[in-house]
Amino acid sequence: MGADRRQAGLFDLPTRLPHGLVYQPGFVTPEEETALLAAIAPLPFREAKFREYFAKRRVVHFHADEHAPSYDSGDADSFSSGPLPPFLSDLKHKVAAWVNVDPASFVHALVSEYRPGTPIGWHRDKPVYGIVIGISLAGFGRMRWRPYDGRFDRKDIVVLDLEPRSAYVMQGPIRWEWQHSMLATRMLRYSITFRTQASETATFRTQASETAR
């Protein structure tokens, strides 16, 4: 992705951060952000729910087609609002060009609304998905990572401030060997997350490691 600071986006990150995380400030322009927020406003948001628990954030899911895997088959939060609307399709192509993958590789998109005080607990995205790309809009977010195996000290936790209009990519070790969380937001914030479908190799490796634990 080149050595330019704005392009690589890694120079402000701790050197001990595992491979696989790329952070890009200014991924969308202020004008693009304004248009995205206007397009997001009328979406049919619902409160995020995992099993019997409701979260503070509200979400809208989109799947590539009716056969695409849901985020969690046991999650009432896995509803789909249909195919991608044009504004998300355009953004998907921009994201695909950035990470050099086929736009058709993305099988899931998630739009999330974080009202002030909204956190996300520690988790790792479901193994049915591979590369994860997130775009931040409107407000700042603080994202954290820690080793997934549970053997870590507080000093091992890595923190990254997500600026409005920035984007990040998680793939490789940081996708499969780390989990992440979001600290409670201080202001209204939106995020758009795109996910590819995991390869059979990646899914098998993840399932095998979980079985071994």
Regions inferred by a protein language model and the residue ranges of each:
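Non-heme Fe(II) oxygenase metal-center motifs and adjacent flexible, charged/small-residue loops
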Residues: 1-213
